[in-house]
From Swiss-Prot:
UniProt cross-references to Pfam families, sorted A to Z: NAD_Gly3P_dh_C, NAD_Gly3P_dh_N
High-level lineage: Bacteria, Bacillati, Bacillota, Clostridia, Eubacteriales
Primary location: cytoplasm
InterPro entries for the chain: 6-PGluconate_DH-like_C_sf (IPR008927), 6PGD_dom2 (IPR013328), G3P_DH_NAD-dep (IPR006168), G3P_DH_NAD-dep_C (IPR006109), G3P_DH_NAD-dep_N (IPR011128), NAD(P)-bd_dom_sf (IPR036291)
Protein name: Glycerol-3-phosphate dehydrogenase [NAD(P)+]
Active site per database record: 188 (proton acceptor)
Gene name, Swiss-Prot/TrEMBL: gpsA
Annotated residues for binding of sn-glycerol 3-phosphate: 106, 133, 135, 188, 241, 251-253
Family note: Belongs to the NAD-dependent glycerol-3-phosphate dehydrogenase family.
Catalysed reaction equations from the record: sn-glycerol 3-phosphate + NAD(+) = dihydroxyacetone phosphate + NADH + H(+); sn-glycerol 3-phosphate + NADP(+) = dihydroxyacetone phosphate + NADPH + H(+)
Cellular component, GO annotation: cytosol
Enzyme Commission (EC) number: 1.1.1.94
Bilayer-spanning residue ranges: none
Length: 330
């Protein structure tokens, strides 16, 4: 059995920590919030992020990064995308070079437009594996069948992580297309936020089907331009993740959109969710990126205006509907 350290004690990180602990691994969780650490260690719960859940005895929490990662074989980065670089800088002097870094965050770095594995690689010389796909913590802890994907520049490391997580209810595939896996997971948050806005405005199934289908095209378009393979975007980390994030009541991006569509301001909606809404950051980052490289992403354009220029969402939808006539396939 292995020692696995989770950086971040949020809902999905906690769900995966329990999965690995149930397989007999020794698991540590690093969290800066002393209340979360004490709740895990003393009460065997993590009620701030996922309620009514028992934390196994072979999981220990720390508010000290060095202690949490001591002699660890795997580090799971279960933190928001904008904190990845700073945490990796802190880890550099604390971990062994052979420790495998597993990223479960979804997004790109603002201002640099770098994928998260690229950010990690700039700061650490360790093997890096990305774990992504359609998965909500609330269903993982119930052991409902879930399928994800691991990808890496080193497929031996990817296979190792595949074996680490694989169970009878948690199936993990490998995919060599690291770019496609990361981009799909990041852009779908933009479309999920838009899907929530549609729900908040009271639009129906026809509208959401159109949004998801044309949103899938935007994922494929920007992903291919960045070097990803189109077939990846129609797999688990693209279409699969898009479906679950646009339709699930567990999705914080959809829930934030729902609040915005119902008339709540963007900042207030994010505060109401209480956790990072990656779709907001992703929208800004990919809007700036697609402007640089000349990729058409009309849904992202409109969502950017709604989020950052206070455009009326209904007028935005009308603008999308009245765009120049064209063929569906282009």
């Amino acid at each position: 059995m292995s020692k696995v350290s989770f950086i971040g004690g949020g809902s999905f990180g906690t769900a995966l920590a329990i999965l690995l602990a149930e397989k007999g691994n020794t698991v540590s969780i690093y969290n800066r919030d002393k209340k979360v650490v004490d709740d895990i260690n003393i009460n065997r719960r993590n009620d701030k992020y996922i309620k009514n859940l028992e934390i196994l005895s072979n999981i220990k929490a720390f508010d000290n990064l060095e202690k949490a990662t001591e002699n660890t074989e795997y580090i799971v980065l279960a933190i928001p995308s904008h904190t990845i670089r700073s945490i990796c800088k802190q880890l550099k002097s604390k971990i062994k070079q052979e420790t495998i870094i597993i990223s479960i965050a979804k997004g790109i770095e603002e201002h640099t437009d770098k994928r998260l594995s690229e950010v990690i690689k700039e700061e650490l010389n360790n093997p890096i594996v990305v774990l992504s796909g359609p998965s909500h913590a609330e269903e993982v802890v119930l052991k409902l069948p879930t399928t994800l994907v691991v990808s890496s520049e080193n497929m031996n490391s990817a296979s190792e992580v595949q074996n680490l997580f694989m169970t009878s209810f948690f199936r993990v595939y490998t995919n060599q297309d690291l770019v496609g896996v990361e981009v799909g997971g990041a852009v779908k948050n933009i479309i999920a936020l838009a899907a929530g806005i549609l729900d908040g405005l009271g639009y129906g199934d026809n509208t959401k089907a159109a949004l998801m289908t044309r949103g899938m095209k935007e994922i494929s378009r920007i992903g291919s331009a960045l070097g990803g393979r189109e077939e990846t975007f129609y797999g688990l980390t693209g279409m699969g993740d898009l479906i679950v994030t646009c339709t699930s009541n567990h999705s914080r991006n959809r829930k934030a959109g729902l609040l915005i569509g119902s008339g709540m301001g963007v900042d207030k909606a994010i505060k109401e969710i209480g956790m990072v809404v990656e779709g907001v950051k992703a929208c800004k980052a990919f809007y700036e990126l697609k402007e640089k490289i000349g990729v058409s992403m009309p849904i992202t354009d409109i969502l950017y205006k709604v989020l950052f220029e206070k455009k009326d969402p209904k007028l935005g939808i009308e603008e999308l509907m009245l765009r120049e006539k064209k063929s569906e396939i282009f």
